[in-house]
């Protein structure tokens, strides 16, 4: 839980604050594996007597207890323990460790997150680690900023774990004892030290699996929510419960050099195929495909091509079957290059910015014209 208790936070109710980040963790001390699944804070959830709301509101309404209950219901798994930390505590942990070594995927310029970071392997201070973990707007041109931020958070958490767990037993125990002041948890210090000892030597590159909850953005009553993609989510959680990686392969965004899901392959950034060519980027986000030519099966085939890029796709018919040209429509100039990428994958089509004529809630709208064969 990355809730921030500073006065500057705009998301609070009474003396409780909304969660800034939520990660569901599975720790397997027998096989010495850990799984980190980030859950969108804006996921629309049912909180029983408190009604439907964004997931991060659970902390503001009922603190850690309601957050744990709500996440457990969403994921369909029992949750044994919880831990939460605010931004200042997170920064202090990194500084107390003498910084952590992180290979920053791309250069970050994001004043809202706290400033600038160079790309590349470096030792991050607490302030620098916080910039990496908070930045969303540095990724505006690539898509869902929350997904990239969540990936960076898991990257930093892995670096923290590596530094703690690579120490000798005595040093590790004293380090955990010292860092405990920054974390609120229902675990006893002795339990944390015992768990750390069983996980000693864990290699984040091969022993930590990670992913993001699959969702689709939707605008409901003037508010943006993330809607859980139930089937994909169930498949992911089934894999997690079996001790498998959340996804069956690494998901890599080549444009930002960010690994969005890890399977223990040892991959930290972008990579190449066996023939030396660069792997295709795996995108995040949603696309609505509309059949505007009346050709049976056109929407299905187009959807499959777009899904290969990594997008979640929803298909249906357009308002008519009279569209002469295929259109890939976006509503933000930062998405122009990605819209063209979709058109290239389809083999036809024109990427164009929405002039207000098209209504859609997804990141992109594709209308198939008669040029689609």
Describe every region a protein language model picked out.
Residues 290-293, 301-303, 311-373:
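BRCT (BRCA1 C-terminal) domain core and associated BRCT-interaction motifs
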Residues 8-13, 52-61, 76-81, 119, ...:
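Second-shell loop/turn segments in exported
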Residues 17-22, 31-39, 50-52, 66, ...:
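Extracytoplasmic
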Residues 19-21, 36, 52, 64-72, ...:
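Extracytoplasmic/secreted envelope proteins and their assembly/folding machinery
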Residues 1-31:
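Entry/capping segment at the start of metal-dependent catalytic domains
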Residues 56-118, 166, 183-192, 199-204:
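Amphipathic, coiled-coil-like alpha-helical scaffolding segments used for oligomerization/assembly
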Residues 93-172, 176, 180-183, 204, ...:
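Flexible, polar/acidic helix-loop-strand segments at domain edges
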Residues 5-6, 187-282, 302:
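C-terminal solvent-exposed extensions
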């Amino acid at each position: 839980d990355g809730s921030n208790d500073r006065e500057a936070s705009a998301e609070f109710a009474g003396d409780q604050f909304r969660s800034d980040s939520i990660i569901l963790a599975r720790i397997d001390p027998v096989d010495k594996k850990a799984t980190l699944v980030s859950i969108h804070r804006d996921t629309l959830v049912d909180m029983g007597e408190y009604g439907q709301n964004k997931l991060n509101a659970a902390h503001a309404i009922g603190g850690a207890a309601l957050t744990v209950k709500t996440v457990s219901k969403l994921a369909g798994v029992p949750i044994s323990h919880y831990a939460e930390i605010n931004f200042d505590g997170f920064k202090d942990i990194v500084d107390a460790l003498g910084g952590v070594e992180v290979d920053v995927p791309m250069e970050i310029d994001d004043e809202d997150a706290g400033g600038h970071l160079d790309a590349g392997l470096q030792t991050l201070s607490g302030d620098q680690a916080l910039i990496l973990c908070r930045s969303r707007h540095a990724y505006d041109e690539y898509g869902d900023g929350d997904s990239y931020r969540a990936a960076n958070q898991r990257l930093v958490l892995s670096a923290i774990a590596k530094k703690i767990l690579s120490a000798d037993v005595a040093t590790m125990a004293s380090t955990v004892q010292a860092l405990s002041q920054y974390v609120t948890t229902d675990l006893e210090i002795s339990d944390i030290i015992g768990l750390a000892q069983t996980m000693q030597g864990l290699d984040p590159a091969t022993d930590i699996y990670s992913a993001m909850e699959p969702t689709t953005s939707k605008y409901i009553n003037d508010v943006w929510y993330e809607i859980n993609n139930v089937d994909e989510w169930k498949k992911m959680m089934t894999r997690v419960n079996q001790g498998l990686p959340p996804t069956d392969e690494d998901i890599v965004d080549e444009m930002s050099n960010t690994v969005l899901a890890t399977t223990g392959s040892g991959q930290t950034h972008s990579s190449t195929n066996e023939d030396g060519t660069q792997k295709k980027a795996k995108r995040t986000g949603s696309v609505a495909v509309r059949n505007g030519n009346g050709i049976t099966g056109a929407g299905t085939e187009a959807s499959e091509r777009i899904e290969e890029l990594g997008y979640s796709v929803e298909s249906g018919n357009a308002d008519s079957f009279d569209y002469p040209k295929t259109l890939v429509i976006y509503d933000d100039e930062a998405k122009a290059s990605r819209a063209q990428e979709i058109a290239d994958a389809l083999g036809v089509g024109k990427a164009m910015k929405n002039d207000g004529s098209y209504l859609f809630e997804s990141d992109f709208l594709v209308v198939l014209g008669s040029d689609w064969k």
